[in-house]
Amino acid sequence: MNVSKYVAIFSFVFIQLISVGKVFANADERMTTFRENIAQTWQQPEHYDLYIPAITWHARFAYDKEKTDRYNERPWGGGFGLSRWDEKGNWHGLYAMAFKDSWNKWEPIAGYGWESTWRPLADENFHLGLGFTAGVTARDNWNYIPLPVLLPLASVGYGPVTFQMTYIPGTYNNGNVYFAWMRFQF
C-alpha cells in the first residue's frame, strides 16, 4: 500500500473516533434531560391520572391459533399516575398500573412515559401523541422477576380523556402484543 492509502484509512478511523465522542456527549445530554423530566413530573405534576386497561391483542400472524384461543385479551385492572404538559405541549407521565396478562395473571408495570403531541384540528382539545415509555414490569411466567421495558407509545385524545397504546415486539408465539388503555386526567 502506498502512503495515500494509509492516510485515507487513518483519516477514516480518526473521523469515526471523533464521531463516537460526539455521540456519547449527546447521550449524556439526553440522559440529563430524561432525569430532569422525570424529576419535574414527580415534583410538579399538573394532573392526576386514572388508567383503565382496555384491550390486549395478540398479532394473529405471529401465533398459533390454539395459543391465541387460550389467551386473555380483555385485561382488567387499573392504575394511577401523575402527569404534566411541557412548554412545547408534549406530555410527560409517571404511572403504576396492574392488569390481567395473557395468562390471566396479574402483571404490574410502573414507569415514565413521554409523547410528542400534535393538535391538528382547530379544536385544541383533540390531540395525537407519539413517544415512548421506559419502566419496569414483572410477569408470573418469569417468576415476577423485575424486567425493564422500553416501548413505543401512541395516543389519540380529546380533552382529559386519552386512548393510549403500545406494541410489545417479539418472536413467533411470544410477544407481538398490542396493549391499550384509557387515561383519564384530573
From Swiss-Prot:
Asked whether the UniProt record includes Acetylation among its keywords, one would answer no
What EC class does the entry list? Answer: transferase
Q: Where is this site: Role in lipopolysaccharide recognition?
A: 67
User: Where is this chain's protein located in or outside the cell?
Assistant: Cell outer membrane
What is the source species?
Shigella flexneri
Q: Specify the signal sequence span.
A: 1-25
Its quaternary organisation is: Homodimer.
User: What is the catalytic activity of this protein?
Assistant: a lipid A + a 1,2-diacyl-sn-glycero-3-phosphocholine = a hepta-acyl lipid A + a 2-acyl-sn-glycero-3-phosphocholine; a lipid IVA + a 1,2-diacyl-sn-glycero-3-phosphocholine = a lipid IVB + a 2-acyl-sn-glycero-3-phosphocholine; a lipid IIA + a 1,2-diacyl-sn-glycero-3-phosphocholine = a lipid IIB + a 2-acyl-sn-glycero-3-phosphocholine
Question: Which Gene3D superfamilies does the UniProt entry name for this protein?
Answer: 2.40.160.20
Name of protein:
Lipid A acyltransferase PagP
Catalytic positions are 58, 101-102
Regarding protein family, the annotation reads: Belongs to the lipid A palmitoyltransferase family.
Keywords, comma-separated and alphabetical: Acyltransferase, Cell outer membrane, Membrane, Signal, Transferase
